[in-house]
Amino acid sequence: IATAMAGIPLVLQEQNAWPGATTRFLSRWATQVHVAFPESVQHLPLLSKDSIHVSGCPIRIPQNQKYERHDLCKKMGLDPGLKVILMVGGSQGSLALNDLMKNGIRSMTSGSLSRLEGWQLLWVTGTQHHTSVDQALSEMGSPGRVRTVPYIEDMPSVLSIADLAISRAGAMTTAELMAWGVPSILIPLPTSAANHQEMNAQALQNSGAAIHLNQEELTPESLWISLEELTKDQGLLERMRHAARARSNPEAATVIVSEIIRLLPGFNQDVRA
């Protein structure tokens, strides 16, 4: 507010479909409000509409880098001939999602759930959960087509080989999934602030880029129903892939910086030029 009173431009960047309280309050005085989700615009004060830019969410996209699927699969311990389901529960992993997947694989190995033929799982457990997940898999006889890792340093490389993802619905995660055109099953974190992950997941499901499942109602059986539907329908996956890419803006950082530079005295050029 002090910056607005002093005539200093105020720029905000909102990453979620439901704008946070700070964004909703300060947007009244903002010169620019950059949003990642077009759905968030309707939740901002009417007076701020002219200053709103649907710019996307700044993420790290490697420039001029080619990803060879065969080589990357080999590097990750995956079979290049099988499609890849990527499961990631956030930077620290998710105990709830890990337990869900463990129980699903246990039922799969016993024959009570589909084996999802032609697919393999790359499971990012989180560092603190990796040992317990591996121990559980060992007790199941170390099922094939399941590869666990504690953490991924180079997520763009992994996203480039993922054919389907199971994930939380945080702003950065969903932005990366959209940028790489990865169809996804989104399971929002129930305790996220203002339930923003729920809003993100619902927005992406409405656009056709994802399937939204609630953790409280989820069982291994219901997760497998969605997995079977997707893994057996390449046409559906392709439509979701196109919908995801349509939602993405991998140049978001450049777009936002370009708009900010326009506010500087004596500058009116596009840094993208």
Please give the residue ranges for each predicted region:
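Short alpha-helical segment that forms part of, or immediately flanks, the ligand-binding pocket
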Residues: 1, 156, 174-182, 202
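Active-site-proximal region of nucleotide-activated glycan assembly enzymes
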Residues: 4-70
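Conserved donor-binding/catalytic loop of nucleotide-activated donor transferases
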Residues: 6, 160-162, 178-187, 207
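Donor-nucleotide binding loops and adjacent catalytic segments primarily
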Residues: 70-74, 78-165, 198-201, 213-222
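Acidic donor-binding loop of glycosyltransferase active sites
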Residues: 149-152, 160-175, 182-183, 228
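A short, well-ordered alpha-helix in the C-terminal region of glycosyltransferases
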Residues: 236-250
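C-terminal alpha-helical cap of glycosyltransferases
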Residues: 249-273
